[in-house]
């Protein structure tokens, strides 16, 4: 993230006490699944700091629970990189790959499925362990929304019609930023489930949307130089400049104000949760699960994203340019 762009996040920084162990071993899983096959790929992946991201997203997780979070973060960004080239401008190829990956939500994959799909299948299998059928169905819906968002992005690029409305762009990016599947894993990592009636409440819905919007704003600021280097036009900064005729500086300031306003609303919504719990007559155990989700899921995905974006090497312009030379990325997504 550009060092002169700051955001006030009113939550303390947290990171799993098991972070160092997880970081030391974080390349083992993608290597074992064939997702990283060269030293250059390993070095590039390490620069992203995905173990750090997982340790901040799931600050109470340790051992195998944290490892699952680390593997999910590794998978997320390997998958996302597959769409930085021609595939990301071809809706048919994008749908072909996202369908191949999403098939893991329905059952075992054929051996011919691309490596990135087998990687997702492994993460999904472990994610579902110990979770109820209702939770698995809810999380699967979130994943399908995430995959469909990539097709929408590809259509925009293919038609060479970049978004000219921040509102329309937000609606699309709320899917592809991947916050909801990320927060779902917080329930799995703490071995708890938010009662569905609370999850469906207007208060929690609004809190999750704020968490999502904050993440995508932080991400667009952090990736600004990277996306500019590769000619990407669908970034909130560029969209605000086109939509309003603003300068880059004013667009960034508007995004900073947007985060501040949203987080003020978030704190007000948090204060409403005890009333929500009372309204739905939650048991002591259900209240504990909901509070774990708030602290170790929703709050941590906001603060953790901010801390990670400020330190990750993923968003340097040279990282983006180097991606075009990583031939292994095409192999990961090959559906031939």
UniProtKB/Swiss-Prot annotation:
Catalytic activity: (2E,6E)-farnesyl diphosphate = pentalenene + diphosphate
Cofactor note: Binds 3 Mg(2+) ions per subunit.
EC number of the protein: 4.2.3.7
Top-level lineage group: Bacteria
UniProt: Mg(2+) 1 binding residues: 80, 84
Positions contributing to Mg(2+) 2 binding: 80, 84
Keywords on record: Antibiotic biosynthesis, Lyase, Magnesium, Metal-binding
InterPro entries: Isoprenoid_synthase_dom_sf (IPR008949), PentlnSyn (IPR054969), Terpene_cyclase-like_2 (IPR034686)
UniProt pathway: Antibiotic biosynthesis; neopentalenolactone biosynthesis
Segments carrying motif DDXXD motif: 80-84
Top-level EC class: lyase
Gene3D superfamilies listed in its UniProt record: Farnesyl Diphosphate Synthase
GO MF entry, a single one: pentalenene synthase activity
Biological process terms in GO annotation: antibiotic biosynthetic process; lactone biosynthetic process
Pfam families: Terpene_syn_C_2 (PF19086)
Cofactor field: Mg(2+)
Subunit description: Monomer.
Family listed: Belongs to the terpene synthase family.
Additional note from the record: S.avermitilis does not produce pentalenolactone itself in vivo but instead a group of new metabolites that are neopentalenolactone derivatives.
Primary role: Catalyzes the cyclization of farnesyl diphosphate (FPP) to the tricyclic sesquiterpene pentalenene in the biosynthesis of neopentalenolactone antibiotic.
Domain statement: The Asp-Asp-Xaa-Xaa-Asp/Glu (DDXXD/E) motif is important for the catalytic activity, presumably through binding to Mg(2+).
Name of this protein: Pentalenene synthase
Gene: ptlA
């Amino acid at each position: 993230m550009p060092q002169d762009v700051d955001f006030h996040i009113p939550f303390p920084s947290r990171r799993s006490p098991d972070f160092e162990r997880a970081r030391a071993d974080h390349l083992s899983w993608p290597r074992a699944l064939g997702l990283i096959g060269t030293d250059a790929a390993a070095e590039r992946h390490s620069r992203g700091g995905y173990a750090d991201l997982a340790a901040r997203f799931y600050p109470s997780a340790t051992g195998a629970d944290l490892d699952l979070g680390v593997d999910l973060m590794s998978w997320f960004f390997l998958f996302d990189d597959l769409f930085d080239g021609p595939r990301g401008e071809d809706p048919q190829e994008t749908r072909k790959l996202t369908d191949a990956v999403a098939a893991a939500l329905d059952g075992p994959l054929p051996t011919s499925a691309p490596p990135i799909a087998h990687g997702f299948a492994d993460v999904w299998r472990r994610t579902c362990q110990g979770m109820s059928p209702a939770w698995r169905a809810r999380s699967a819906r979130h994943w399908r929304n995430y995959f469909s968002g990539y097709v929408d992005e590809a259509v925009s690029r293919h038609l060479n019609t970049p978004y000219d409305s921040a509102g329309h762009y937000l609606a699309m990016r709320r899917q592809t930023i991947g916050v909801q599947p990320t927060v779902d894993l917080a329930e799995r990592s703490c071995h708890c489930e938010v009662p569905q009636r609370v999850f469906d409440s207007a208060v929690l819905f609004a809190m999750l949307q704020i968490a999502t919007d904050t993440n995508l704003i932080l991400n667009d600021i952090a990736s600004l130089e990277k996306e500019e280097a590769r000619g990407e036009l669908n970034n909130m900064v560029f969209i605000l400049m086109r939509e309003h005729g603003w300068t880059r500086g004013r667009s960034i300031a508007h995004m900073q104000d947007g985060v501040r306003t949203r987080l003020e609303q978030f704190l007000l919504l948090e204060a409403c949760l005890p009333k929500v719990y009372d309204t739905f007559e939650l048991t002591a155990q259900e209240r504990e699960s909901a509070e774990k989700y708030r602290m170790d899921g929703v709050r941590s995905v906001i603060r953790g994203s901010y801390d990670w974006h400020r330190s990750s090497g993923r968003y340097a312009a040279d990282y983006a340019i180097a991606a075009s030379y990583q031939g292994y990325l095409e192999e990961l997504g090959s559906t031939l």
